[in-house]
Amino acid sequence: MKNTELEQLINEKLNSAAISDYAPNGLQVEGKETVQKIVTGVTASQALLDEAVRLGADAVIVHHGYFWKGESPVIRGMKRNRLKTLLANDINLYGWHLPLDAHPELGNNAQLAALLGITVMGEIEPLVPWGELTMPVPGLELASWIEARLGRKPLWCGDTGPEVVQRVAWCTGGGQSFIDSAARFGVDAFITGEVSEQTIHSAREQGLHFYAAGHHATERGGIRALSEWLNENTDLDVTFIDIPNPA
């Protein structure tokens, strides 16, 4: 498949044109024209690029790519090394950010809901779905369930939350700023990847459970699901590689 055809295929699947983002979605660094072997991962880190070189990949597809708004345009240090690896080995780099958060099937939010057994009921606002657990559970039990499913112990604040949790809202990655919207909407718990100092005060003062389950851990699902979709619907050879990250 041509590199531009792959870009078009995924753009159409994720409906990228309909979503305003703060990073370019699609082909970010051009490599060889023909793509057959692909490595995927959450972030285009040097470790992931090194794995792509080792495996002889023609392309790398990630959720967190390069060239973010506000990023310095200077190419030196870490950025230079990453780009050098891609260009020297003629490897294409693709990134899909918010489109891979929002997709109702392959998206990070949809995948996290499926992993945790949450029935999606609707959206509080874009990128912030809400839903219900199959049965109400105590806050500590939900923390243990999240740890078992994600392989990472979440930071949990349940100081003033209800005795049991059933109605939840979530936003994968760095979605902690949405906790106030979730509280106003009326949920028992809010799940995201990261935590800020003020997030804990918001949880305590608005009476809901809060779980920070890891930016990386909550966003493995989307890129893994996209990898599986490509393997099932094309003749491409796609390998998802999880580079460990406790954050």
Swiss-Prot record:
Q: Where are the transmembrane segments?
A: none
What happens when the protein's gene is inactivated?
A: Cells lacking this gene show a 2-3 orders of magnitude drop in survival after exposure to ionizing radiation as compared to a wild-type strain.
Q: Which GO terms describe its molecular function?
A: identical protein binding; metal ion binding
Give the UniProt record's GO annotations in the biological process aspect.
DNA repair; protein hexamerization; response to ionizing radiation
**One Gene Ontology CC term in the entry:** cytoplasm
Residues holding a divalent metal cation 2: 64, 215, 219
Binding, a divalent metal cation 1: 63, 101, 219
Q: Which SUPFAM superfamilies match?
A: NIF3 (NGG1p interacting factor 3)-like
What Gene3D superfamilies does this protein's entry cite? NIF3 (NGG1p interacting factor 3)-like
Keyword tags: DNA damage, DNA repair, Metal-binding
Q: What does this protein do?
A: Provides significant protection from radiation damage and may be involved in the degradation of radiation-damaged nucleotides.
Q: Which family does it belong to?
A: Belongs to the GTP cyclohydrolase I type 2/NIF3 family.
Assembly and partners are described as: Toroid-shaped homohexamer. In the hexamer, 3 dimers assemble to form a ring-like structure surrounding a central hole.
Task: Return the protein name.
Answer: GTP cyclohydrolase 1 type 2 homolog
The gene it comes from is: ybgI
